[in-house]
Design a protein with these regions (language model features):
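Intrinsically disordered, low-complexity Pro/Gly/Ser/Thr-rich segments with frequent PxxP/GP/PP motifs
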Residues: 181-219
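Short acidic, flexible loop segments centered on an aromatic residue
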Residues: 164-181, 187-189
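Feature representing long, continuous alpha-helical segments
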Residues: 7, 11-19, 61, 65, ...
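Short, surface-exposed ligand- or partner-binding patches at beta-edge/loop junctions that are enriched
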Residues: 208-237
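Hydrophobic helix-and-loop "lid/oligomerization" segment in the mid-to-C-terminal part
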Residues: 1-45
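Intrinsic-disorder/low-complexity, polar/charged segments enriched in Ser/Thr/Lys/Arg/Asp/Glu/Gln
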Residues: 152-154, 202-206, 243-245
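Secreted, periplasmic, or luminal enzymes acting at the cell surface/secretory milieu
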Residues: 32-168, 174, 228, 232-236, ...
Length: 251
């Protein structure tokens, strides 16, 4: 698919999918692709989409396990899917440049936004559905500051399976540097953990924040640098679906 400049589904495949939908029967779109594509039409018209990338010779067995409910899906996107090709390039860890519009907002005068779609992606980095549901609660940090030389913090949050199926959830830790000597991304993935939960079960998930998680590569110094200052620890089920944010300071 990387040989095509068009990121939407080819017309012949779209016509076939549209014809299947018009039968009135339930349809699941199994989407093979080696890169993010524009799936806005599919998202609006297809009841369910299973993105399988290029899974190899045994992918059919894995796909059947998911479709027939033998396995609860738990995958998360490792790339951002745009609403429109005109949004590209698009990354979850973008810089806070221009006059940015707050996440979830559609349009506001004198802000850096489009007039035909929101700034948000169709499917954000880290996104993924499950046959069950999860609740996050009680995010905490082990301290409100850490030492630059040898300190570290732990971020913890409680995850509960509020649905009816055994399932895995991937808890994601992002870091935001509030003010730096260079422009830093609005958030950067610095850790994640998969947790398996039975229906009604809850577990405390703990993730470590160390100096490396707060560092960036300084081109002038040719080394990794962690600058003292204020940060935010952000835990979510994706880069967009934030479940908790706690500030802390690097001293």
């Amino acid at each position: 698919c990387s040989s095509r400049t068009e990121l939407e589904m080819p017309d012949a495949q779209r016509d076939l999918l549209d014809a299947l939908l018009k039968t009135g029967k339930p349809v699941v779109l199994v989407h093979f692709s080696g890169r993010p594509t524009v799936m806005t039409w599919e998202q609006q018209h297809v009841p369910s989409i299973l993105n399988v990338w290029f899974g190899g010779s045994e992918s059919a067995d894995a796909i059947c396990d998911v479709l027939f409910g033998d396995v609860c899906p738990s995958g998360k996107l490792t790339a951002t899917f745009p609403q429109n090709v005109g949004q590209l390039p698009m990354n979850y860890n973008h810089k806070n440049t221009g006059r940015p519009l707050a996440e979830g907002r559609w349009f506001e005068k004198f802000r850096s936004n489009y007039i035909d779609v929101s700034n948000d992606p169709l499917y954000p980095f880290g996104y993924g559905l499950s046959y069950t549901t999860f609740a996050y609660s009680d995010m905490q940090l082990s301290a409100d500051s850490m030492n630059k030389q040898n300190g570290e913090l732990t971020a913890s949050i409680t995850v509960t399976n509020t649905g009816n199926y055994d399932a895995d959830e991937i808890v994601q830790l992002y870091i935001r540097d509030i003010v730096g000597s260079i422009t830093r991304p609005v958030k950067e993935l610095k850790g994640f953990q998969k947790v398996k939960l039975a229906p009604g079960e809850e577990k405390a998930v703990t993730l470590t924040i160390d100096k490396k998680a707060l560092s960036f590569f300084d081109d002038a110094k040719h080394e990794w640098v962690a600058e003292p200052g204020k940060f935010e620890a952000i835990i979510g089920s994706s880069s967009r679906d934030v479940k908790g944010t706690v500030p802390f300071e690097l001293k």
